[in-house]
Each structure stands twice: as C-alpha cells, then as structure tokens.
Amino acid sequence: MTRFAPGAPAWFDLGSPDVAASADFYTGLFGWTATVVSDPGAGGYTTFSSDGKLVAAVARHQIDTPYHRPYGPGNDQHGMPAIWTVYFATNDADALTKRVETAGGDVIMTPMDVLGLGRMAVFADPSGAAFAVWRKGVMEGAEVTGVPGSVGWVELVTDDIGTARGFYRATLGLAPADTGRKGVTDPVWHIHDTPVAGTRELGTTGAVRPHWAVLFSVHDCDATVRRAVELGGSVENEPVDTPRGRRADLLDPHGAGFSVVELREAYPAAADGAS
C-alpha cells in the first residue's frame, strides 16, 4: 500500500443522495466491486475496489453548502448535492485546521475521528473550492492510483490561481510550478518534485463554482463515455485529445462531476519516504 506524503491526494469519496444508485452507476462504469462497511456507525459507507484494491468510496451526503454545489443549485435530484471530494494526506489534521484558518480558508467540518480508520476534516479554500484532509489510522488511503480503474489525476478548478498558489503552499505544502509542456499553461502542484495535482480554469466545464475535480484513468475514453450515457450519466465535454491524454468531462446521474482520461503517462502518488 502506498505511503502518502503530507499534501498528496490520498483518498477520494463521493457524497451522494442515493448511495445504492451511485454504487450501481460506478460499478457498471468502471467494473469496480462495491462493499458496504459492516460497522453500524459507518452509515452505509460503501467502498469501491478495482482488482481487489481500494480506489474510492461513496457515502450518503449530509453536508449542503454552496461549496458542495460546484454546478449550481440544480446539481441534485433528491434535495442534496452530489460531489466527489479529494482528501489530502496530513500528519496532523488539527494543526492543519489552524493553518487553513490563518490562510483565509473556511472550516466546513472540524477534525473528527472516523471509526478508528483515521482522522478527517473538511475545508474550503478562499475561492470556495471544498477539499478534505486525512490523517491515517489503520486506513492509509487508496491502495492504487494512476492506473486504469483508479483515480489518475486531480485538478483544482478555479478562477483565482494567484490566491490558490499561496493558500495551498501554506496549508498543504504544495508547490506550484509550470509544466514546461507544450499546450499546458496552468501550473501543476508538486511535492518533493513529484507532480500530484493540476489546475484548470473555471469556465472550461459547466461548473459555476471552484472545486477539486477527480479524473479517473481508463483504457478507452470514448467507450467509457458511451457507457456512462447508457448508465444514465451525461456529457459535459466530449472526448478531446489533450497534452495529458484523451479526456472527457461527465456528470453522473445525480449531478456529480468527474472526468475520464487515457493518461499518456502515469502520475505516481507522492510517497512518504518514511519506512
């Protein structure tokens, strides 16, 4: 299992108004296996595995703030929004909460222990993009990333990259740097010289608010898009070739945005060098 360095994207879950329906959609789309956590205190939290390795999860969404509606008030069908959340690894969720407040972010959910699995908190950056942090307990995070069937990349979709540069450096220790690649102008976030996340200009998708976007690695972007539509999803941006690979932007049946991409190269998670 990967040991995630502080600041690296470590876990990904979907907040949904209908966990069972969302599980059906994503297992049908990616071939995942869904497993409901047996602990009664988990509230039906359902994990997704690809080839036996944890990749993501879905939970009943119980938080409704403007931060959780990046596609506006219409991105739900059951009174609650649906959204993917990126969790960044941290060694101390409580200390990071203080850094978020100092840097001008908002605390949506104060640090809390999660069934002995770890400790989490939920924040929003100064532009309103929601994200979470994860202090590992017995659960490290995703057991695989960067390969088809798992999260391949994450992006900050924002209209204020200048403020984001300072905020994420001060809170998560992310260092923004230009890619140096032809056709890619938005900065990429690094940890120890390892690229871990990207940025995208707000307005390139149907989103109306800043947010963190999740991109799933797939073998065939076009076939995945067709399958998503068959399962009740919709297309925000049709497949297009990009410097990072062929990608498309989608909405699931409950309005949660996500992307699929045929990565030209895998982006490894920033691993913690501790033994």
From Swiss-Prot:
<keyword id="KW-0045">Antibiotic biosynthesis</keyword>
<comment type="function">
    <text>Involved in the biosynthesis of the anthracyclines carminomycin and daunorubicin (daunomycin) which are aromatic polyketide antibiotics that exhibit high cytotoxicity and are widely applied in the chemotherapy of a variety of cancers. Acts jointly with DoxA in the conversion of 13-deoxycarminomycin and 13-deoxydaunorubicin to yield carminomycin and daunorubicin, respectively.</text>
</comment>
<feature type="domain" description="VOC 1">
    <location>
        <begin position="8"/>
        <end position="136"/>
    </location>
</feature>
<dbReference type="InterPro" id="IPR052164">
    <property type="entry name" value="Anthracycline_SecMetBiosynth"/>
</dbReference>
<dbReference type="InterPro" id="IPR029068">
    <property type="entry name" value="Glyas_Bleomycin-R_OHBP_Dase"/>
</dbReference>
<comment type="pathway">
    <text>Antibiotic biosynthesis; daunorubicin biosynthesis.</text>
</comment>
<feature type="domain" description="VOC 2">
    <location>
        <begin position="150"/>
        <end position="263"/>
    </location>
</feature>
<keyword id="KW-0677">Repeat</keyword>
<protein>
    <recommendedName>
        <fullName>Anthracycline biosynthesis protein DauV</fullName>
    </recommendedName>
</protein>
<comment type="pathway">
    <text>Antibiotic biosynthesis; carminomycin biosynthesis.</text>
</comment>
<dbReference type="GO" id="GO:1901771">
    <property type="term" value="P:daunorubicin biosynthetic process"/>
</dbReference>
<dbReference type="InterPro" id="IPR004360">
    <property type="entry name" value="Glyas_Fos-R_dOase_dom"/>
</dbReference>
<dbReference type="InterPro" id="IPR037523">
    <property type="entry name" value="VOC"/>
</dbReference>
<dbReference type="Pfam" id="PF00903">
    <property type="entry name" value="Glyoxalase"/>
</dbReference>
